Amino acid sequence: MDWENLKRFWRIEVMGGEHKPLKLKKMLHRIRLKEQEHYLFWFRLAQHFYRRPKGLLNYPKLARRIHARLVRTHGIDIMLAAEIGPGLNFAHRVGIVIADAARIGDNLFIRQNTTIGVRATGQKGLIYIGNNVELGANVCIIGDDLRIGDNVTVGAMAFINKDIPDNSSCYTRHVTMINPK
């Protein structure tokens, strides 16, 4: 991620639109007052540092420190190696985990207690998620070489371990059985 790309992410996710000006005073005001913008600003900066080679400063180490603080402060654990397009948005910033094997397109809307991960550590498979995807609360996406298409809506409490085609909605049917004693 180069400097221009980082500014583009900040413009879209912190300032609220790709064509909005990136003014330092207004951006700092938003970061200080809004928790989501605070998280996204520091997460994107940490990703930028993580992908830079060591130089005068140990940028990857600085990125890991920023990431550790974000996990403690916000309860969101998105690995720095995960590739997520601009437009990341949270309904509630609690219990969100995204593995480093995730490759996610633009405009992901994610709700609380959602996990995107691989089956086992050391697996080489990636999880591809397209553009304009909406994930409900308590969604669990686990698999290797898993593909979720563009314009997909995943319902609350869904367990996804198979591919989902473009322009689909997906949910897991839950049945509550109540039997007399």
Description of each model-found segment:
Residues 74, 79-80, 85-86, 91-100, ...:
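Left-handed beta-helix
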